């Protein structure tokens, strides 16, 4: 079973449809989590300032807004915005919607195995910045496809990890690996996917409409055979 969610997105009026293809073998449904506001000094939890680059995703379930970070991930932002302005994302699909993990799209082929870049489709390198983490709501460039680590391209995802996903054991592991107390506290409050921090690139963060992202992740889906 597949459900189309028609969407208009971003900074130059990018429009595309989200076709949700689940990751489980049977149809499943979930209830969107309740997310409290996170009080943190981490930049990803600050409201955008004048002059910040904002991505606006207008979907049939509501609007999502994300601030982009060209200072920390210049190539990821340049590629995303360039492709959006060119119309590349028009009528592409969200091929992965996994509750408590992520919703992912950006492959014009709709399979998750392809992608494009503004550099004649040549991939760009990983941009891992210690000031940006895979907190819930992070907008990320996907580098791992089919179990292989690839260069960056058009594929992106929103982290939908649950608020309680980073438990005390994982918090201690983060401290042991040099994460600051502020970052550990942010992960504990927001939830996230810290094991992806040096694997994929974070280039934005949802600051409005995370409830919409969660609704997309909760749409009943079945495995796309």
Predicted segments, located by residue:
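Cyclophilin-like peptidyl-prolyl cis-trans isomerases
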Residues: 14, 22-225
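Sec-dependent N-terminal signal peptides of Gram-positive bacterial secreted proteins and lipoproteins
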Residues: 3-25
């Amino acid at each position: 079973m597949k459900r189309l969610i028609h969407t208009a997105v971003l900074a130059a009026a990018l429009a595309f449809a989200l076709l949700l293809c689940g990751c489980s073998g049977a149809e499943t449904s979930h209830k969107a989590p309740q997310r409290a506001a996170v009080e943190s000094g981490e930049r990803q939890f600050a409201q955008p300032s004048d002059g910040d680059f904002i991505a606006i995703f207008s979907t049939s379930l509501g609007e999502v807004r994300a601030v982009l970070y060209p200072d920390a991930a210049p190539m990821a932002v340049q590629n995303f915005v360039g492709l959006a302005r060119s119309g590349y994302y028009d009528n592409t699909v969200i091929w992965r919607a996994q509750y408590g993990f992520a919703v992912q799209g950006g492959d014009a082929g709709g399979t998750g195995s392809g992608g494009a870049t503004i550099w004649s489709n040549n991939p760009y390198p990983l941009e891992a910045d210690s000031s940006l983490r895979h907190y819930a709501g992070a907008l990320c460039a996907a580098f791992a496809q089919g179990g292989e680590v690839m260069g960056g391209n058009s594929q992106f995802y929103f982290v939908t990890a649950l608020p309680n996903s980073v438990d005390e054991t994982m918090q201690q592991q983060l401290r042991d690996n040099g994460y600051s107390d502020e970052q550990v506290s942010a992960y504990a409050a927001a939830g996230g996917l810290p094991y992806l921090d040096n694997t994929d690139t974070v280039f934005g963060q949802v600051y409005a409409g995370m409830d919409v992202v969660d609704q997309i992740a909760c749409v009943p889906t079945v495995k796309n055979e």
